[in-house]
C-alpha cells in the first residue's frame, strides 16, 4: 500500500525506536500535532500496520520497503583550500574534530541506519581514504581523476547511474544528530535550516517544495549538503548530469545546481528541515579552531 506522508513519518519513528511510544512521544519526535498523531495512529491501527502497543507489524515493515534507502554516496574529492594549513596534508573529510574524523560522523549514522551500500568519490589525497576501510569494510571508493579540473559535478558524473533511492552527502559536515540519516525516505528532499537571513547558499520554498536556489537571502532555508533522490528523480538525474556535464560551461557547475536550478523543471524536491545544532559545516580553518581548541595554537 502507498502511505501518506504522516503515516510514513509515524511508522518510521516507531520502526526506528523499537520501543513502546505514547502519542505524546510520537508528536515530539515527529513534529506533528497531537491531533494529527492521534488520527494517523488510528489509520495505522485500522490497516494493521501497527498493533495496540504502537509497535510495527510485519505488514507495517512490508509497507515501508518501497521507501528503503539503497545507498549513500559521499562526495569527497575536493581540496578544501579555505581549511589550509590543515588540508595541505589531510583531505578535509579526514580532518579530526574532537578526536573523530569529520566523515566518520556521517558514516556512523549511515551504518546505524542500515543503509547497505556506501560509495565515496575521492580525489585530492585519495589514497588516504583507504584507512576508513578498516572500520567500514563495505565502503567502495571511486577515484575522480578530474577533481582539480572541474567542479564537483565531475564527481556526480562518475556515479550518475547510482542515484536512484540514494543519499548524496558532502563529506565536510559534522553530524551531531544521527537521526537525520534514515533507513527510509518518503520523497526526494534536501536538508535545510530555516533562517531569517543568510549570506550562504540557500533556497526558497513554497508549500515545502524548493522553488529557487540562490546565494544569500531572507526568510529562507540555508542549505546543508545532504540530499535524497527517489527512483524517478535518480533516473532523471542520470540523464541530466550527463547532458549538463557535456554542455559548454557544464564542468563549472556545482552538482546540486542540476536538480535545484539548471534542470529544476524536471524535479519536485522537498525541504527536509533540520535544527540549529543538528549539523555543522566547517568552511574555514578559523571555524575549525572555534569548534576544536586543539587547533588554536
Labelled PLM ranges:
Residues 2-32:
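Short amphipathic alpha-helical interface segments
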Residues 9, 177-249:
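Conserved core of the sugar-phosphate nucleotidyltransferase
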Residues 11-14, 63-126:
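N-terminal glycine-rich phosphate-binding loop and ensuing alpha1 helix
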Residues 15, 55, 61-72, 223-297:
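Conserved alpha/beta core of the MobA/IspD/sugar-nucleotide pyrophosphorylase nucleotidyltransferase superfamily
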Residues 35:
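Key DNA-contact positions within bacterial/archaeal DNA-binding proteins
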Residues 45-54:
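A short, conserved structural fragment
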Residues 130-201:
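Conserved beta-loop-beta/alpha segment of the NTase-like Rossmann-fold superfamily
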Amino acid at each position: 500500500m502507498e502511505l501518506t506522508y504522516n503515516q510514513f513519518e509515524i511508522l518510521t519513528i516507531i520502526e526506528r525506536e523499537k520501543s513502546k511510544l505514547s502519542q505524546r512521544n510520537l508528536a515530539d519526535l515527529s513534529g506533528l500535532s497531537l491531533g494529527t498523531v492521534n488520527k494517523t495512529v488510528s489509520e495505522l491501527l485500522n490497516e494493521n500496520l501497527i498493533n495496540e502497543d504502537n509497535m510495527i507489524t510485519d505488514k507495517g515493515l512490508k509497507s515501508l520497503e518501497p521507501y528503503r534507502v539503497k545507498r549513500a554516496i559521499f562526495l569527497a574529492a575536493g581540496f578544501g583550500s579555505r581549511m589550509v594549513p590543515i588540508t595541505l596534508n589531510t583531505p578535509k573529510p579526514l580532518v579530526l574534530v574532537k578526536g573523530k574524523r569529520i566523515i566518520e560522523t556521517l558514516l556512523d549514522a549511515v551504518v546505524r541506519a542500515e543503509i547497505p551500500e556506501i560509495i565515496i568519490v575521492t580525489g585530492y589525497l585519495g589514497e588516504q581514504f583507504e584507512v576508513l576501510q578498516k572500520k567500514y569494510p563495505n565502503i567502495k571508493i571511486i577515484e575522480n581523476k578530474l577533481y582539480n579540473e572541474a567542479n564537483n559535478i565531475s564527481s556526480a558524473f562518475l556515479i550518475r547511474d547510482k542515484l536512484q533511492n540514494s543519499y548524496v552527502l558532502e563529506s565536510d559536515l559534522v553530524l551531531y544528530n544521527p537521526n537525520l540519516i534514515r533507513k527510509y525516505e518518503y520523497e526526494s528532499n534536501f536538508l535545510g535550516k530555516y533562517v531569517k537571513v543568510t549570506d550562504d547558499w540557500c533556497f526558497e520554498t513554497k508549500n515545502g517544495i524548493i522553488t529557487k536556489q540562490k546565494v544569500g537571502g531572507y526568510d529562507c532555508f540555508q542549505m546543508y549538503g545532504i540530499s535524497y533522490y527517489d527512483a524517478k528523480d535518480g533516473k532523471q538525474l542520470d540523464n541530466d548530469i550527463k547532458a549538463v556535464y557535456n554542455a559548454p560551461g557544464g564542468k563549472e557547475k556545482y552538482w546540486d545546481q542540476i536538480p535545484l536550478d539548471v534542470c529544476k523543471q524536471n524535479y519536485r524536491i522537498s525541504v527536509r528541515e533540520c535544527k540549529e545544532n543538528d549539523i555543522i559545516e566547517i568552511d574555514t580553518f578559523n571555524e575549525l579552531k572555534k569548534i576544536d581548541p586543539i587547533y588554536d595554537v
